[in-house]
Amino acid sequence: MTRKKAGDYTPEVLRLFDKFVHGDISRREFVDRAAAFTVAGASAAALLETLLPDFVTGQVVAENDARLTTSRREYDSPRGAGRMSGYLARPAAGADRLPGVLVIHENRGLNPHIEDIARRLALEGYLAFAPDALTPLGGYPGNEDAARELFQRLDREALVEDFVAAFEFLAGLPDCTGKVGAVGFCFGGGMVNQLAVRVPELGAGVAFYGGQVPAELVPSIKAPLLLHYAGIDERINAGWPAYETALRANGIEYEAYVYDGANHGFNNDTTPRFDAAAAELAWRRTLDFFTSNLKG
């Protein structure tokens, strides 16, 4: 079966899907409202299924890739949820000590796509650690709908503490140089912005279509930032002008790019919103940014 692309859907359906993914409407509401945009003989429920992630087809680096060593690791988050879990990936050969990258998932916890992102970074010479924010609720449940519902039950303040603790855990590993950056997607992109405020030791922050922090918090940012925005993303982009003004006013080092024609989630190659050209360019910029700030 040929994989669908964003262009195969009407803008109205993609907007409804974005609302569904972010918990603004239920599955039933999506089906009811998307029915107006289906073609004869197709159901809105079937339409939704084509928009959901295909983790097998979208995988880039296999779980058992012999070039890597991967493991599940636990760490303490005393100011957050307590005992947390995550996925650690590193090259099987090469330098004993490597710079670290914290990989922060979307609003569904540590799913196979984010584990794949960690493996991709490990192949680039990083110690990549992807925490699972759903650990206190049993971890990623293997189902995106269930994961989304669980995520809404998490304490937002504790969440930030869990990722601060993850940064500290990664930076303190014996095989980490102590230079640690962070990359996040959607919820994770917003968390990168929050970590930039909370963690002065953050070596570099890369946010893919992530929510911004309030302007009054920007003076606390010490890390250089790389910010990727989708051209078609009203919800996230609405906060960008004020954020950019605050970054400039406070002399924060940053790069920002808007990928025209790309939808929110354009880097996620497991869904039709994936935009290969935008994702390739954003990923190349991300790797160059980490090289400049973490490997020097």
Predicted segments with their positions:
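Gly/Ser-rich "nucleophile elbow"/oxyanion-hole loop immediately N-terminal to the catalytic nucleophile
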Residues: 144-183, 293-295
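N-terminal secretory signal peptides
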Residues: 1-29
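Short beta-strand/loop motif that positions the catalytic acidic residue
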Residues: 227-229
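Short beta-strand element of the alpha/beta-hydrolase
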Residues: 97-106
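Primarily recognizes the serine-hydrolase "nucleophile elbow" in alpha/beta-hydrolase
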Residues: 165-222
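N-terminal cap/lid segment of alpha/beta-hydrolase-fold proteins
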Residues: 57-94
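Cap/lid segment of the alpha/beta-hydrolase catalytic domain
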Residues: 108, 134-157, 265-270
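N-terminal export signals
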Residues: 18, 27-53
